[in-house]
Swiss-Prot record:
Expressed in entodermal epithelium along the body column. Residues 19-57 form a propeptide. Belongs to the arminin family. The keyword Coiled coil does not apply. One of its GO terms (cellular component) is extracellular region. It comes from the Eukaryota. This is Arminin 2a. It is found in: Secreted; Target cell membrane.
Length: 81
């Protein structure tokens, strides 16, 4: 009789552990998915910010300004001759 109770008790503990293990496993899975989604949202926000900086109507404006600063004194000197 004691053996039967011991086996039933161990079976009860095993079932309880299995249910709690599945719950813990599911909770960990949900947390990981939640963290991944939050990271993706942050990265997409960063990408949106970068695209706003890159989306310029005149993307080579800085190069033209640099070129113009280098050429302007030569034009001014040519006009004085």
């Amino acid at each position: 009789m004691k053996t039967v109770f011991a086996i039933l008790f161990l079976a009860f503990i095993a079932l309880t552990y299995a249910r709690s293990y599945e719950d813990v496993k599911e909770e960990i899975k949900n947390e990981v998915v939640k963290e991944i989604l939050e990271d993706l949202e942050e990265e997409s926000d960063e990408l949106d910010d970068k695209s706003k900086e890159i989306n310029d109507a005149k993307p080579y404006r800085w190069l033209r300004n640099k070129w113009w600063r280098r050429i302007r004194p030569d034009i001014r000197m040519a006009g004085k001759k």
